[in-house]
UniProtKB/Swiss-Prot annotation:
Phenotype when changing L9D: Strongly reduced ability to promote N5-methylation of ETF1 together with HEMK2/N6AMT1
Residues of the TRM112 domain: 2-119
Protein name: Multifunctional methyltransferase subunit TRM112-like protein
Gene: TRMT112
Organism, scientific name: Homo sapiens (Human)
Regions annotated as coiled coil: none
Effect listed in the UniProt record for changing S10F: Abolishes interaction with THUMPD2. Increases expression of exogenous TRMT112. No effect on interaction with N6AMT1, BUD23, METTL5, TRMT11, ALKBH8 and THUMPD3
GO biological process, one term: transcription initiation-coupled chromatin remodeling
Xref: Pfam families: Trm112p
Signal peptide: none
Length: 125
């Protein structure tokens, strides 16, 4: 699971609502998986990043040199875009868990895929 994906996921356990974000990330296996650099794509994703969730996830993974927010003129700043490309798209959680901050519900990550399926009792009606 890429950090970009993590930044978009939230819990939909019944009664949680908007308090199901951000999911707490705990990884037992992380890999760096090279991806072709696409500065236009990264620049388009920057405004969508929820920075507090991103920084918390990066801290949980013990990543270093993580920008605290978008730099001015980031669209033309190749160094910033490459750093964000690496963090959002190349750092992959292979095994671990995501935890709902409100309900405590754990969602497993297996082979890079987060399992967000809920039982019928957990779903919102």
């Amino acid at each position: 699971m890429k950090l970009l994906t993590h930044n978009l996921l939230s819990s939909h356990v019944r009664g949680v609502g908007s308090r199901g974000f951000p999911l707490r990330l705990q990884a037992t296996e992380v890999r760096i998986c090279p991806v072709e650099f696409n500065p236009n794509f990264v620049a388009r994703m920057i405004p969508k990043v929820e920075w507090s969730a991103f920084l918390e996830a990066a801290d949980n993974l013990r990543l270093i040199q993580v920008p605290k927010g978008p730099v001015e003129g980031y669209e033309e700043n190749e160094e910033f875009l490459r750093t964000m490309h690496h963090l959002l798209l190349e750092v992959e959680v292979i095994e671990g868990t995501l935890q709902c901050p409100e309900s405590g519900r754990m969602f497993p990550i297996s082979r890079g895929i987060p399992n967000m399926l809920l039982s019928e009792e957990e779903t919102e009606s």
